[in-house]
């Protein structure tokens, strides 16, 4: 978000907008975390090693997203990236519950990790810009 764009809105409104995105991100993750046993049972995965490999795709996606998120935030701005990444994060969460194959689940978990980290990076970038504007003005 550019500094000029921020000043067009009241400071409290800006703070609450960013806070609401952090809240939405936390709700998405807690929704997934509470459903892990159900998803495991849905796919009849009883091998702990195999299930661990499937779940490991989340941090792999997060790792892959680090350079991608930095590039996109610098190109498009944190405001657009927050909106796009929250949408992708919620969509991947929906798809986790809708897939019928363990391989599709793995792909959804990978993209869940990608959008989760893109959301983290763009939200924190947005938060830094807002914090600086609130302190210096």
Predicted feature locations:
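Conserved MFS/SLC helix-loop-helix module at the cytosolic interface between two early adjacent transmembrane helices
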Residues: 67-89, 93-96
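Hydrophobic core of transmembrane alpha-helices in multi-pass small-molecule transporters
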Residues: 104-119
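Central cavity-lining transmembrane alpha-helices of secondary-active solute carriers
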Residues: 53-70
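Pair of pore-lining "gating" transmembrane helices in MFS-fold secondary transporters
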Residues: 11-35, 110
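Intracellular juxtamembrane helix-capping segments at the cytosolic ends
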Residues: 118-131
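Conserved small/polar residues in nucleotide/adenosyl-binding loops
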Residues: 135-137
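Helix-breaking motifs and short loop linkers at transmembrane-helix boundaries and internal kinks
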Residues: 98-103
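Short amphipathic helix-loop junctions that connect adjacent transmembrane helices
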Residues: 34-48
């Amino acid at each position: 978000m550019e500094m000029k764009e921020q000043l067009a809105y009241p400071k409290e409104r800006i703070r609450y907008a960013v806070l609401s995105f952090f809240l939405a991100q936390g709700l998405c993750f807690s929704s997934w975390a509470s459903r892990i046993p159900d998803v495991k049972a849905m796919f009849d995965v009883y091998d702990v090693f195999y299930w661990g490999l499937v779940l490991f795709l989340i941090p792999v996606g997060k790792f892959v997203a680090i350079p991608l998120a930095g590039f996109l935030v610098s190109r498009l701005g944190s405001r657009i990236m927050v909106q796009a990444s929250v949408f992708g994060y919620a969509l991947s969460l929906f798809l986790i519950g809708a897939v019928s194959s363990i391989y599709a689940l793995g792909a959804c978990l990978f993209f869940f990790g990608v959008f989760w980290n893109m959301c983290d990076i763009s939200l924190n970038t947005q938060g830094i810009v807002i914090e600086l504007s609130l302190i210096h003005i």
